[in-house]
Amino acid sequence: MRILGIETSCDETAASVVMRDEEGRGRILGDVVLSQLEEHSAYGGVVPEIAARAHVEALDTLIVEALLRAGVKLEDIDAIAATSGPGLIGGLIVGLMTGKAIARATGKPLYAVNHLEGHALTARLTDELQFPYLMLLVSGGHTQLILVKGVGEYERWGTTIDDALGEAFDKTAKLLGLPYPGGPAVERAARTGNPERFDFPRPLVGDARLDFSFSGLKTAVRQAAKSLEPVTEADIADICASFQRAISRTLRDRVGRSLKRFKAESASVAQPALVVAGGVAANQALRQTLQSLCDEHGFRFVAPPLSLCTDNAAMIAWAGAERLAAGLPADGLDVAPRSRWPLDAEAKALIGSGRRGAKA
């Protein structure tokens, strides 16, 4: 089967054609992503109105380009998959309405995909991973530990009670006068810094729960920078290195506990696996921490290519293919976008978790 995927949940406009064969193996036939970095960089973050307008201007052209790269026509497509949430509502409307129009015009089924499910299933596209497995999602809008049991079957083990990890990176960069996006800027600065100069806090470390908290770390960064004013480049490098060290130590505690829990509850799984997904997964220091943890606990560490960790339409197309192959029903043309859409509908909301970024 061939699926056309559309992604417009935040500040990337993307279209992709993905094939899934009868054995369940996937292949990306055509994939196009257009970043809006230049449009938002002057504001130090994503401006929803600008993002939505940029999606309108680019999406049609990107869909045509994805089909051309795949060497197929619309009539060769078996289904349409479009991100329906969570994310910025303006962008979601653009992508989902486009998907509906194509589905109506071609008579093909439409799958309104949860963006987080796209991340959760990417490892099956890239590494043919079998269920169940554990996923750490780290992005600008989410920091979650999720047990992936099957297509449409997810159990949230932990989440952030305040800032997402990507948000903490962006805010730290902004505090230090580093460019947007903040994640790569902080990582670059940290390479020449002393990670032990500042002993930043690690909230919730040692707690029996698997939840995260990063707002206190952000506050500590602000206080450190203020105490050094005017800060030098060396100070900034040391703050960034110490910031990353605090995050790595936090992940060792939270993720380490989750690996032990997975082994205890899924003892029959011969080769347990941890998947990392989301834009922050590009950070090499954090990848090294997770690889080390997996080595210690006997887990396979799966990190999809960086192009599939950040927002893309291939993962949306693949999620649609997985849902179609599993026999899950398509969505009606009256399906509505959802700015908030938890992957685990049974998970309880946490006190203090009201603000969660663009993709809450």
Swiss-Prot record:
<dbReference type="GO" id="GO:0005506">
    <property type="term" value="F:iron ion binding"/>
</dbReference>
<dbReference type="InterPro" id="IPR017861">
    <property type="entry name" value="KAE1/TsaD"/>
</dbReference>
<feature type="binding site">
    <location>
        <position position="183"/>
    </location>
    <ligand>
        <name>substrate</name>
    </ligand>
</feature>
<feature type="binding site">
    <location>
        <position position="119"/>
    </location>
    <ligand>
        <name>Fe cation</name>
    </ligand>
</feature>
<dbReference type="InterPro" id="IPR022450">
    <property type="entry name" value="TsaD"/>
</dbReference>
<keyword id="KW-0963">Cytoplasm</keyword>
<protein>
    <recommendedName>
        <fullName>tRNA N6-adenosine threonylcarbamoyltransferase</fullName>
        <ecNumber>2.3.1.234</ecNumber>
    </recommendedName>
</protein>
<dbReference type="InterPro" id="IPR043129">
    <property type="entry name" value="ATPase_NBD"/>
</dbReference>
<dbReference type="GO" id="GO:0061711">
    <property type="term" value="F:N(6)-L-threonylcarbamoyladenine synthase activity"/>
</dbReference>
<comment type="function">
    <text>Required for the formation of a threonylcarbamoyl group on adenosine at position 37 (t(6)A37) in tRNAs that read codons beginning with adenine. Is involved in the transfer of the threonylcarbamoyl moiety of threonylcarbamoyl-AMP (TC-AMP) to the N6 group of A37, together with TsaE and TsaB. TsaD likely plays a direct catalytic role in this reaction.</text>
</comment>
<keyword id="KW-0408">Iron</keyword>
<dbReference type="InterPro" id="IPR000905">
    <property type="entry name" value="Gcp-like_dom"/>
</dbReference>
<dbReference type="GO" id="GO:0005737">
    <property type="term" value="C:cytoplasm"/>
</dbReference>
<feature type="binding site">
    <location>
        <position position="283"/>
    </location>
    <ligand>
        <name>substrate</name>
    </ligand>
</feature>
<keyword id="KW-0808">Transferase</keyword>
<feature type="binding site">
    <location>
        <position position="170"/>
    </location>
    <ligand>
        <name>substrate</name>
    </ligand>
</feature>
<keyword id="KW-0012">Acyltransferase</keyword>
<dbReference type="Pfam" id="PF00814">
    <property type="entry name" value="TsaD"/>
</dbReference>
<keyword id="KW-0479">Metal-binding</keyword>
<feature type="binding site">
    <location>
        <begin position="137"/>
        <end position="141"/>
    </location>
    <ligand>
        <name>substrate</name>
    </ligand>
</feature>
<comment type="similarity">
    <text>Belongs to the KAE1 / TsaD family.</text>
</comment>
<keyword id="KW-0819">tRNA processing</keyword>
<feature type="binding site">
    <location>
        <position position="115"/>
    </location>
    <ligand>
        <name>Fe cation</name>
    </ligand>
</feature>
<dbReference type="GO" id="GO:0002949">
    <property type="term" value="P:tRNA threonylcarbamoyladenosine modification"/>
</dbReference>
<feature type="binding site">
    <location>
        <position position="311"/>
    </location>
    <ligand>
        <name>Fe cation</name>
    </ligand>
</feature>
